[in-house]
């Protein structure tokens, strides 16, 4: 074999006349009777190789045996393509290689799907043969983008004086948040490690240790129900700083994101990012992670309709609820009664009991509920919703949470269905002024809105144990195009405040000591004020790559059932392994192994 001199996708007209050596995979082979054309592919792209008897009968004979995905080494001369054969869709489309020698490095079975960007093969097949799926150029480009993003983050933070420090993967299980992945200890029978849901406690301990500026491209693990933008193991950009204010951390994050966008995508973004309070986001968009690339904002019309004869609206308001509406501009003729019924079924998934509607015509409002509103009420709706002839008004009446969830989801659906979203935009947004705690009706207790180490707003501290739902957090989330990129906060750094927080979350003194005693003790040794942020790398790459599935940004992802179709993990283990770990599997359906 002979050493490579060029990558396939990097040969240009400047190389015409040169002898080159290429290595790669056969993308396509065409036999034109006496001439064979092979599209040779490597990670940089494709180049056309021509085998002819005039140049080398021996090479032509070998080329006749070649099939798709064979691995080849080819030596030949770069020549210009003839007029009429130029391919403007290829960077190498003006040249081709006249092959003089060819070596079949390895043969290949016929793949279960064609190795091209466009494929309609089931995702399960792609995941089972992930090594073939990753040959598709679109997959390589996505992972190449991931590399550029990660490199840009490291370069930026290094320039800001941050140290990359690795924290433990085998750690202690804590009860907050999602379920832990547990790892049994062989040397400590009946005891378990947990895989980290985040490096949260360790990065705070690094601040106690005086490192001041830490970051890590951290692997994290959560045993939770999955969806398209979740994975059981994921990667986050983890940052922690001492002696910096919330404002300074947010500005640092903005500068980092601007650097990443420039280095990874060649895009300039404007700073600072817009900011919106949590309450405003819920009020205007029905979401704490709003997509601001399009309108369709929620408008509260409760005051206008509270005394109307439409009992659904009046009753909801009388019971402490609200009525909100979305004005879908110019959509009155686009939605039939059947279409609106389908939208009603959609909002029902989010708890809404119905979807009321009105169409705006030149002489007023029309629709099944129009008769219940006086002329003054109709004019009030038209004025408040800035409605014009041809608009479609959609209403939900219920408790505030149901209204926000239902109309927030409907807003996103309408934005997609009506092509209102500018897919070329990257709209970053800070969500601030979060509640510190959230009350769970089922469990009858409070949970941390972010995590138990978030610092409350100082002036709200006296209410932490008496009126916890009123306490605000020094927390901030970064949103991009309707996705939560990540969240950050100032951290509790005083033992007394941390103990108050644990009590508000329902921990007994003994439980807090058992779970977090080491952290509470650390706070007694001169802990600096500190804060940070964690951003989802997988999700960031998904958005920058224009993908809709998180699995497309990870080399070897898990399915929605947290399994790996390639390696067939998780899998049973031997009886001997279980004995060494002091474990017994309690299952009616045991594998034959057991």
Swiss-Prot record:
It comes from the Bacteria. Its EC number is 6.1.1.23. L-aspartate binds at residues 176, 222, 450, 491. Keywords: Aminoacyl-tRNA synthetase, ATP-binding, Cytoplasm, Ligase, Nucleotide-binding, Protein biosynthesis. One of its GO terms (molecular function) is transferase activity. It holds the Pfam family tRNA_anti-codon. The record marks 84 as: Important for tRNA non-discrimination. It is found in: Cytoplasm. The keyword Metal-binding does not apply. It is an enzyme of class 6 (ligase). GO terms for biological process: aspartyl-tRNA aminoacylation. Residues 200-203 are annotated as: Aspartate. Gene3D superfamilies: Bira Bifunctional Protein, Domain 2, GAD-like domain, Nucleic acid-binding proteins. Signal peptide: none annotated. InterPro entries: Aa-tRNA-synt_II (IPR004364), aa-tRNA-synth_II (IPR006195), aa-tRNA-synth_II/BPL/LPL (IPR045864), Asp-tRNA-ligase_1 (IPR004524), Asp-tRNA-ligase_1_N (IPR047089), Asp/Asn-tRNA-synth_IIb (IPR002312), AspRS_core (IPR047090), GAD-like_sf (IPR004115). GO terms for cellular component: cytoplasm. It catalyses: tRNA(Asx) + L-aspartate + ATP = L-aspartyl-tRNA(Asx) + AMP + diphosphate. ATP binds at residues 222-224, 231, 484, 536-539. Belongs to the class-II aminoacyl-tRNA synthetase family. Type 1 subfamily. HAMAP family: Asp_tRNA_synth_type1. Aspartyl-tRNA synthetase with relaxed tRNA specificity since it is able to aspartylate not only its cognate tRNA(Asp) but also tRNA(Asn). Reaction proceeds in two steps: L-aspartate is first activated by ATP to form Asp-AMP and then transferred to the acceptor end of tRNA(Asp/Asn). Homodimer. This is Aspartate--tRNA(Asp/Asn) ligase. It comes from Geobacillus sp. (strain WCH70). The lineage of its organism: Bacteria, Bacillati, Bacillota, Bacilli, Bacillales.
